[in-house]
Amino acid sequence: MAAPGWGRWVLGLGPLLLQVFLPFQLVAGRWGPEGAGGGVRRGLAEPSVVAKHEDSLFKDLFQDYERWVRPVEHLNDRIKIKFGLAISQLVDVDEKNQLMTTNVWLKQEWIDVKLRWNPDDYGGIKLIRVPSDSLWTPDIVLFDNADGRFEGASTKTVVRYDGTVTWTPPANYKSSCTIDVTFFPFDLQNCSMKFGSWTYDGSQVDIILEDQDVDKRDFFDNGEWEIVSATGSKGNRTDSCCWYPYITYSFVIKRLPLFYTLFLIIPCIGLSFLTVLVFYLPSNEGEKICLCTSVLVSLTVFLLVIEEIIPSSSKVIPLIGEYLVFTMIFVTLSIMVTVFAINIHHRSSSTHDAMAPWVRKIFLHKLPKLLCMRSHVDRYFSQKEEARSSRGPRSSRNALEAALDSVRYITRHVMKETDVREVVEDWKFIAQVLDRMFLWTFLLVSVVGSLGLFVPVIYKWANIIVPIHIGNENK
């Protein structure tokens, strides 16, 4: 009975022994010279040495480094800053507030004589990355900033063993831009960004333009604006004692007018030509005034929409604004003419005096022929001649007329009604002549006005854009 009990005791002790000795074996196998992980541990020794060299390099470089002092050997030495600009996105152009928002990278490179070392003394390290807050950086800012943020982001710099420091911080700028909306929406804008040192003059820090063209390799297109050209130039501002260098980048941007053409210009032109159709409606239709009033209200709404887009300035009036004002005057005149034509249409001998001879001559004889209308006189001439011919025989029969007074009375009454009806028809025909005359007049004015306003601007816009694109392709 003892043997089986001893066996159960050994079996119960087995798991305990595994829990004690197995971790020890794993640790021994991992860290021992024969373990599987021994090679990995020995492989980490080399990066550790590199890290020690880099730590030693940082300590030697920045132990006595003062980042507020210009890194020059002599006080009169000048630091030359190679400056370049790369644009990643044209975020927005705010015409109302006259601002241009951009995302850019500021490329800056200079020599820091305090950050030089021999790579052989530090394990072959040729460059290090240092936070920009830990070393001297030029205080180059955007002068024409509009939101109070004059500097870029605080990012790391790349320092080479020969002292060359490269710093490319990203920045989001809102720069002031004078917007000229004269040819809106076929407008080109010239917005500039002026960079320079905030405190150093040219004898201490000189700015050198690295590349005349702005780097647009990583540019993300904007849906409303297109950059036609972006070039930089160097300038100097001189005062009584010193000179201050600066770099100015000029961005020539053009608006993509398709959206405004489809949803603003074409509806305005359509409303303008819709006004012409008012004169095609009969004068006895009351919808003529309603149509004119509806067009006028629609133009007012378009004018309010444009007022929200363009800046409030009395110096220039945008092209589309001129066209809307022209169309509103056009519609107002059409309302006045329509009211006059309706008044003419409803005239009669009982409400107005007899028609003047010159009115009858011009509007019943001459204008209908010029307007390719059938003459109103021709329609009633045969009836009048028949009436006159019928009066002759009746007048020659005096005896019969005396006997037939009642018939004569009826005849005179019928003739009077006929004359009254003819007078009414004459006035209605004059109203038709006026409608036809104003139809062609307003159509001609609308076509000439639309072409006169938009064609020269589009032609000029196309002639400016095409040579610039050809020049950019040649580059």
Swiss-Prot record:
Intrachain S-S bonds: 177-191, 241-242
Q: Which residues lie on this side of the membrane: Cytoplasmic?
A: 345-437
Where does this protein chiefly localize?
membrane
Which Gene Ontology BP terms does the record give?
acetylcholine receptor signaling pathway; behavioral response to nicotine; membrane depolarization; monoatomic ion transmembrane transport; neuromuscular synaptic transmission; presynaptic modulation of chemical synaptic transmission; response to nicotine; synaptic transmission, cholinergic
Q: Which Gene3D superfamilies match?
A: Neurotransmitter-gated ion-channel ligand-binding domain, Neurotransmitter-gated ion-channel transmembrane domain
Molecular function in Gene Ontology: acetylcholine receptor activity; acetylcholine-gated monoatomic cation-selective channel activity
Q: How does it sit in the membrane?
A: Multi-pass membrane protein
Subcellular compartments: Synaptic cell membrane; Cell membrane
* Positions bearing carbohydrate: 190, 236
What keywords does the record list, in alphabetical order?
Answer: Cell membrane, Disulfide bond, Glycoprotein, Ion channel, Ion transport, Ligand-gated ion channel, Membrane, Receptor, Signal, Synapse, Transmembrane, Transmembrane helix, Transport
Q: GO CC annotation: what is one?
A: synapse
Keyword set includes Secreted: no
- Residue ranges crossing the lipid bilayer per the database entry: 262-282, 289-309, 324-344, 438-458
Signal peptide range equals: 1-29
**Record InterPro entries:** Neur_chan_lig-bd (IPR006202), Neur_chan_lig-bd_sf (IPR036734), Neur_channel (IPR006201), Neuro-gated_channel_TM_sf (IPR036719), Neuro_actylchol_rec (IPR038050), Neurotrans-gated_channel_TM (IPR006029), Neurotransmitter_ion_chnl_CS (IPR018000), Nicotinic_acetylcholine_rcpt (IPR002394)
Extracellular domain ranges by topology: 30-261, 459-475
Family membership noted in the UniProt record: Belongs to the ligand-gated ion channel (TC 1.A.9) family. Acetylcholine receptor (TC 1.A.9.1) subfamily. Alpha-5/CHRNA5 sub-subfamily.
What does the UniProt record say this protein does?
Component of neuronal acetylcholine receptors (nAChRs) that function as pentameric, ligand-gated cation channels with high calcium permeability among other activities. nAChRs are excitatory neurotrasnmitter receptors formed by a collection of nAChR subunits known to mediate synaptic transmission in the nervous system and the neuromuscular junction. Each nAchR subunit confers differential attributes to channel properties, including activation, deactivation and desensitization kinetics, pH sensitivity, cation permeability, and binding to allosteric modulators.
Instruction: List the PANTHER family.
Output: NEUROTRANSMITTER GATED ION CHANNEL (PTHR18945)
Identification of the protein by name = Neuronal acetylcholine receptor subunit alpha-5
* Species of the source: Bos taurus
Please name the gene that encodes this protein: CHRNA5
